[in-house]
């Protein structure tokens, strides 16, 4: 395999970065800000007016009362709302049904799922205590009323002097015919204005992947002179319909329009020996971000790791030399080591492509929006598990995150496998076993709200609610960290099954998808793009469109 000119350039960039960090004394010992020293950053976020995650109720959860699917003595529910919040049930719900689910209840994901799974467990972004309205489980008791109606109301939130606010909340909604979920706002005791509506006209009943394990971000205009706002979550359904769960509610000041030009990256993963689609994806990315400052390749670049496969990819990269950004940053995936040859041989082929001497490293993208740090993680030894990691790599990540947090910079982290309970598919339990240090890495990232983890491997649809997830952790920063599914250049997968214990993953179709990432001083904007498939070298199509986008504010920006 002949290294391309761009490969040589990225090797030089990595060496220059390492040299500059050594000179600054920042490799091996992260710079510590006042009172931080690499410890979890739990500073408040200036633009957040109100935050409610229901976790203050954790010590008040009651033992199982009536639910027939939960073992006696297991604790995990209460009807007592957080201070200032309230629940109002319809008049017909006072008697009958299962006590635990009489209107909006405050519970945990595990307790709720113990009642019955039926996709409840997929609410993986939930942190500790959540709010749940469940007409299905309520109907498992005698004398269940014909209708289910319940409203969760926020405490009055100060909005005086503001023209607009932004409401965000995590949401897990499964619809049914006749069922409705609504979010409204009322100012100073006035009439309610509808902000969000889920019903049979707006939701695919029984299963709508866009609304499971999702988040809602809703702009809200504030009338002149208004002082306080109350938000309400209304849920109505016939008996024995489905459910709605909510967590991590926040009301914040909207971001101002972005200022200046960004530093930009292309992101691709899971090419797996499809050089034609890779070449087409690079051309489509160049069409929409011709001045990109980096290409991030998030693993599974080849199908099994043979020399011929690497040569095919290198041929595509060489043919795209005039298009490629100056920096190409690669992470190792599981498909880089499937030929049956020794791990060291397969690893070294990847490292030859990546033009560095270890699987993990640090890069700086340099563009109009300034310098953007990129941290690369990866498998260091033969599996199992899928991602064995040395303590040196974990501690290096800890130090580098602390270093960039101290400078209030958003940092891009790329690693092929998702962490458990983050993006699409990772709610399936075996994804929590991919990393040797899954829980430690999750807690570590949760202390750094400026960190954004880009992961591939799952091939799941961008259309799902958990394509991009703000994942919070116990004891971490209240904003948690973001993680984004990179899609795939080769085939799409999805999950099938009602319960996690019997879940199946299947291939659904051929795809060609990736991301663009625009980094500004105070935010990162990620666009999930569809390039369409091709079946011959140098062939193109008319598909090059945005499927989803997410704007990730930098909570540490001044």
Label every PLM stretch briefly.
Residues 1-34:
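Secretory targeting and sorting signals
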Residues 38-256:
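Beta-sandwich/jellyroll recognition modules and their flexible linkers
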Residues 253-310:
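N-terminal active-site segment of His-dependent metallophosphoesterases
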Residues 258-259, 503-558:
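A short C-terminal boundary segment appended to hydrolase-like catalytic domains
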Residues 262-272, 371-381, 412-416, 481-488, ...:
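Active-site-proximal beta-strand elements of phosphoester/diester hydrolases
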Residues 267-269, 295-300, 328-334, 413-415, ...:
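Active-site neighborhood of phospho(di)ester-bond hydrolases with catalytic His/Asp-centered motifs
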Residues 307-407, 436-441, 446-447, 460-520, ...:
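Extended active-site neighborhood of metal-dependent phosphoesterases/phosphodiesterases
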Residues 404-424:
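Short acidic, glycine-rich surface-loop motifs adjacent to enzyme active sites
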């Amino acid at each position: 395999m002949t290294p391309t000119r761009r490969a040589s350039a990225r090797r030089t960039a990595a060496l220059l970065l390492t040299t500059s960090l050594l000179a600054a004394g920042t490799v091996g010992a992260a710079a510590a800000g006042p009172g931080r020293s690499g410890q979890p950053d739990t500073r408040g976020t200036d633009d957040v007016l109100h935050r409610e995650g229901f976790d203050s109720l954790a010590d008040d959860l009651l033992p199982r009362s009536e639910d027939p699917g939960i073992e006696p003595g297991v604790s995990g529910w209460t009807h007592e709302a957080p201070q200032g919040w309230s629940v109002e049930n319809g008049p017909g719900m006072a008697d009958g049904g299962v006590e635990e689910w009489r209107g909006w209840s405050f519970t945990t994901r595990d307790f709720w799922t113990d009642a019955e799974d039926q996709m409840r467990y997929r609410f993986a972004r939930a942190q500790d205590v959540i709010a749940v309205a469940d007409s299905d489980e309520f109907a498992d008791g005698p004398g269940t009323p014909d209708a289910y109606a319940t409203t969760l109301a926020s405490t009055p939130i100060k909005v005086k002097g503001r023209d607009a606010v932004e409401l965000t909340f995590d949401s897990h909604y499964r619809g049914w015919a006749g069922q409705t979920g609504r979010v409204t706002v009322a100012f100073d005791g006035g009439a309610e204005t509808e902000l969000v509506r889920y019903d049979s006209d707006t939701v695919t009943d029984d299963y709508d992947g866009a609304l499971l394990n999702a988040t809602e971000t809703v702009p809200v205009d504030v009338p002149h002179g208004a002082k306080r706002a109350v938000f309400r979550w209304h849920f109505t359904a016939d008996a024995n319909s489905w459910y709605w769960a909510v967590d991590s509610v926040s009301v914040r000041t909207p971001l101002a329009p972005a200022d200046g030009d960004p530093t930009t990256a292309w992101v691709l993963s899971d090419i797996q020996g499809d050089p034609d689609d890779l070449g087409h994806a690079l051309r489509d990315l160049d069409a929409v971000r011709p001045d990109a400052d980096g290409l991030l390749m998030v693993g599974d670049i080849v199908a099994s790791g043979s020399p011929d496969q690497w040569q095919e990819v290198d041929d595509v990269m060489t043919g795209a030399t005039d298009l490629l950004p100056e920096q190409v940053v690669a992470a190792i995936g599981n498909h880089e080591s499937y030929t049956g040859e020794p791990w060291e041989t397969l690893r070294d082929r990847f490292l030859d492509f990546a033009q560095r001497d270890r699987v993990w490293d640090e890069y700086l993208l340099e563009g109009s929006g300034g310098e953007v740090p990129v941290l690369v993680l990866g498998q260091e030894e033969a599996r199992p598990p899928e991602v064995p990691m040395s303590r040196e790599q974990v501690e290096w990540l800890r130090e580098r995150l602390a270093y960039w947090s101290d400078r209030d910079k958003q940092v891009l982290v790329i690693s092929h496998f998702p962490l458990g309970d983050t993006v699409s598919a990772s709610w399936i339990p075996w994804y929590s076993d991919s990393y040797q240090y899954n829980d430690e890495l999750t807690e570590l990232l949760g202390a750094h709200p400026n960190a954004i983890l880009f992961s591939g491997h799952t091939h799941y649809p961008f259309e799902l609610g958990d394509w991009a997830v703000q994942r919070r952790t116990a004891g971490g920063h209240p904003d948690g960290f973001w993680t984004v599914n990179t899609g795939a250049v080769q085939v799409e997968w999805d999950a099938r099954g009602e319960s996690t214990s019997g879940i199946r993953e299947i291939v659904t179709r051929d795809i060609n998808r990736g991301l663009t990432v625009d980094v500004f001083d105070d935010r990162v904007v990620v666009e999930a793009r569809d390039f369409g498939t091709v079946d011959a070298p140098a062939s193109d199509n008319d598909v090059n469109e945005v499927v989803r986008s997410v704007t990730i504010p930098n909570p540490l920006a001044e």
